[in-house]
């Protein structure tokens, strides 16, 4: 079963997964993927209190914003085995500093904020750029924001 927690539920979201409360999501999930903006309400959402509510052996993946995770709390959970593994494409301070505690965790994969950079994504960016330049040279505007 695919579950999701979102403060802003939508009909489209209901087509993809079942909405549940955060505590239920934390308690039942084998994998927790963070795909959310950084708001005051989401900052530090992965912290020692919420980690304690998770299943033993959970895997946490953060592709969103570094400050969603309290890095020391995640490190402690990785070291204790509460969290079996983590993968983060973002950290609280970028570029990552040499003293970031997650660099010491053997069961944590860290990538340099490149999860968006799949070949298809990069190709789409190049195609849009070429189309925008062609339109400009032809005297047309595309995606004009100051109109």
Predicted feature locations:
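Short alpha-helical segments used as structural interaction elements across diverse proteins
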Residues: 1, 62, 119-121
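Rossmann-like adenosine-cofactor binding region
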Residues: 7-101
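Short, hydrophobic secondary-structure boundary micro-motifs
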Residues: 5, 86-87, 143-147
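C-terminal helix-to-coil terminal segments
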Residues: 92-147
């Amino acid at each position: 079963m695919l579950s999701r927690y979102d403060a802003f539920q939508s009909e489209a979201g209901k087509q993809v997964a079942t909405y549940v409360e955060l505590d239920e999501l934390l308690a039942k999930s084998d994998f927790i993927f963070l795909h959310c903006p950084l708001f005051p309400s989401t900052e530090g959402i992965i912290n020692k209190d919420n980690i304690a509510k998770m299943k033993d052996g959970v895997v946490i993946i953060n592709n969103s914003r570094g400050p969603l995770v309290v890095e020391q709390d995640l490190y402690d959970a990785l070291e204790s085995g509460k969290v079996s593994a983590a993968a983060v494409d973002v950290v609280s301070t970028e570029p990552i500093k040499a003293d970031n505690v997650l660099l010491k965790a053997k069961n944590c994969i860290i990538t340099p904020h490149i999860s968006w950079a799949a070949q298809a994504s990069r190709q789409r960016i190049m195609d849009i750029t070429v189309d925008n330049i062609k339109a400009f040279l032809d005297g047309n505007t595309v995606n004009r924001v100051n109109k």
